[in-house]
């Protein structure tokens, strides 16, 4: 199993969707810990509801239990390091806007990939299909993708990330959108960086990488699955019959507290072309 941390702040309903998707498509690959932060008692109520739901469900369905940890430190990385103090050899980071929409390769194949290649990360959000970088900028529409690399174990693409444009999808080894790391590498990176707000994780860690803070410690190669299996969905577009709540995090949490959950089966994952989507979320 892969030691896996899901980072969440004020999004218990979206977290529920991710956990459901992992249980549907993750098999027994991920050993889950949720690191959550609630800015109010009402959001905390949402997290308690999610915890109770999955605790009951896991006993019934014989899923591995999910551990829950509330954020304590002003530096997010300190909390991550505490959780990962007794981690397994491989570590995966998700956040509460992710959805795992396809099955992932077996642990045996992923471990073999890391054993036979020196890599910074295996990305589950990238693949041959993620050709778009930014759909709202004509000059930055298409992703800077690897022009050369390897195809290993019939499932993984491997390339030199240092040859990719900085701060673009295929040039960013450090992400909480379904990236898998060797435990020693990610722990070293977390120790050398400070992240106060999860939304700045990619920017702060990548900034350290490009400044040379991890000089000589980060392999230039990274990898991805042949086709992406994870997306980040904003849930800014909502469709339901409840007219009294808006699409803000507060409104979404109100729906969740009242017993409505985001319907995983309402999403169409057949034409994914970028790691970030803006699908309409349907509540049921």
Model regions and ranges:
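N-proximal low-complexity "stem/linker" segments adjacent to membrane-targeting elements
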Residues: 1-21
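C-terminal catalytic/acceptor-binding lobe
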Residues: 178, 184, 188-284
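Short, acidic, metal-binding catalytic loop of nucleotide-sugar glycosyltransferases
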Residues: 20-30
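Short beta-strand/loop segment that forms part of the nucleotide-sugar
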Residues: 29-41
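Active-site nucleotide-sugar/metal-binding loop of Leloir-type enzymes
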Residues: 80-90
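Conserved catalytic core of nucleotide-sugar-dependent glycosyltransferases
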Residues: 106-194
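Short beta-strand-to-loop acidic/aromatic patch adjacent to the donor-nucleotide binding site
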Residues: 88-99
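A short, glycine-/small-residue-rich helix N-cap motif at loop->alpha-helix starts
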Residues: 14, 68-81, 101-102
């Amino acid at each position: 199993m892969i030691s896996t941390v899901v980072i969440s702040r004020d999004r218990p309903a979206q977290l529920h969707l991710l956990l459901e998707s992992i249980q549907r498509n993750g098999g027994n690959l991920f050993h889950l810990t949720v690191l959550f932060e609630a800015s109010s008692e009402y959001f905390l109520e949402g997290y308690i509801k999610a915890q109770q739901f999955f605790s009951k469900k896991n006993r019934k369905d014989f899923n591995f239990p999910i551990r829950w940890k509330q954020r304590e430190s002003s530096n997010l990385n300190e909390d991550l390091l505490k959780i990962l103090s007794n981690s397994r050899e491989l570590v995966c980071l998700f956040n509460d806007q992710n959805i795992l929409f396809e099955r992932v390769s077996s642990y045996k194949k992923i471990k073999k990939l890391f054993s036979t290649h020196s890599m910074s990360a295996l990305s589950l959000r990238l693949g041959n299909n993620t050709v778009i970088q930014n759909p709202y900028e004509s000059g930055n529409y298409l992703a800077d993708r690897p022009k050369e690399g390897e195809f290993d174990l019939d499932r993984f693409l491997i390339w030199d990330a240092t040859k990719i444009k900085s701060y673009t999808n295929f040039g960013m080894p450090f992400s909480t959108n379904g990236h898998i790391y060797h435990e020693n590498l990610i722990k070293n990176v977390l120790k050398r960086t400070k992240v106060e707000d999860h939304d700045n994780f990619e920017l702060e860690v990548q900034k350290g990488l490009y400044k040379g803070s991890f000089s000589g410690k980060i392999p230039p190669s990274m990898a991805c699955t042949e086709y992406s299996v994870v997306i980040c969905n904003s849930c800014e577009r909502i469709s339901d019959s409840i007219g009294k709540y808006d699409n803000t995090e507060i409104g979404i949490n109100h729906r969740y507290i009242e017993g409505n959950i985001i319907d995983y089966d309402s999403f169409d994952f057949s034409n994914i072309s970028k790691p970030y989507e803006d699908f309409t979320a349907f509540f049921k």
